[in-house]
Amino acid sequence: MHAPRFWSGGDGGWPARLLAPAAALYTLATARRMRGTGWRAPVPVLCCGNLTAGGAGKTTVALDLAARLVARGRHVHILTRGYGGRARGPLLVDPARHSAAEVGDEALLLARVAPCHVSADRAAGARAAVAAGADCLVMDDGFQNPGLRQDMGLLVIDGGSGFGNGHVLPAGPLREPVAQGCRRARAAILIGGDRTGALAHLPPALPVLRADLAMQEAAPMLAGRPAIAFAGIGRPDKFFDGLRAQGIRLAACLPFPDHHAYRPRDVRRLSAMAAVQGAVLLTTPKDAVRLPPAIRAQVRSVDVTLAWADPMAPERLLDMWLDKASS
């Protein structure tokens, strides 16, 4: 589903006021749940989380940090809920055998970098990872899940959307109040410019790392042809804007709901549009793994990575995490 418009800014107007009692109950329930004491893993645990519903860049950050740990020679394993997949886990993801319908799109991307375990029960997933030889764990999401104790919690913030209208679900996009979440965080990562003033709501003592999304050059994929871009991610407009910034000639932009399961009718529509326009179909890696096999050969996936403002900042962050966990 798409986020309601009243979540995106201002005070949310009358819909947010109408939903304020439900938001208060949600806040209370979250606070009570977070009082639980989770399982303490025998290895360091880092969580890439956020405070809002929807995409903020958590998976991109998890991929980046896990790749850095692999480069250090660490036996890092990644934990994810497997949103959009049927598997409850714990299940070690095999990209050659599992589909997005089974384990979710994010798990398939994460498994390309390091062993990835899908588990709705984070503690059970951590136990499976440790038994499989993990010497450190990176969680993709799960900041509001108390089942597994975290040595370091990171808040990933999308600079374009920030904290929306500042209200908690369902009155706004927040999973919990900003102040409450910041008390458990060790650092924040701002992706893109702070266009909504989100940083003003963070405690002054909370370290903030800055990064931008770096999109793969798409022009070589097009050979002079126009493109039809489509995406079913948290904020598809970010993907479309990134292509426009490269000067790509977009014949059409088609947003789909986050984690959309592409069906035969979607394939027929995309194929027909590409044929009529003489265009190349462009999408994100997360969408590519959800496509039916019949159309994958027609689609080009445009990768996105992180470009850190301070290239050494993520390395210092990992040092701080590992040093804290070993002390």
Swiss-Prot record:
Per UniProt, ATP binds at T52, A53, G54, G55, A56, G57, K58, T59
Cite the entry's keywords alphabetically: ATP-binding, Kinase, Lipid A biosynthesis, Lipid biosynthesis, Lipid metabolism, Nucleotide-binding, Transferase
- InterPro entries given for it? LpxK, P-loop_NTPase
Write out the GO cellular component annotations. plasma membrane
Q: What is its EC number?
A: 2.7.1.130
Pathway listed for it is: Glycolipid biosynthesis; lipid IV(A) biosynthesis; lipid IV(A) from (3R)-3-hydroxytetradecanoyl-[acyl-carrier-protein] and UDP-N-acetyl-alpha-D-glucosamine: step 6/6
Signal sequence, renumbered to the chain: none
Q: Which Pfam families match?
A: LpxK
Q: Name one GO biological process term.
A: lipid A biosynthetic process
Q: Which reaction does it catalyse?
A: a lipid A disaccharide + ATP = a lipid IVA + ADP + H(+)
Gene Ontology MF: a single term: ATP binding
The lineage's top-level taxon is: Bacteria
Q: CDD domains recorded for this chain?
A: SIMIBI (cd01983)
Function of the molecule = Transfers the gamma-phosphate of ATP to the 4'-position of a tetraacyldisaccharide 1-phosphate intermediate (termed DS-1-P) to form tetraacyldisaccharide 1,4'-bis-phosphate (lipid IVA).
Belongs to which family? Belongs to the LpxK family.
Q: What is this protein called?
A: Tetraacyldisaccharide 4'-kinase
- Provide the species name: Gluconacetobacter diazotrophicus (strain ATCC 49037 / DSM 5601 / CCUG 37298 / CIP 103539 / LMG 7603 / PAl5)
Q: What is the lineage of its organism?
A: Bacteria, Pseudomonadati, Pseudomonadota, Alphaproteobacteria, Acetobacterales
Gene transcribed to yield this protein: lpxK
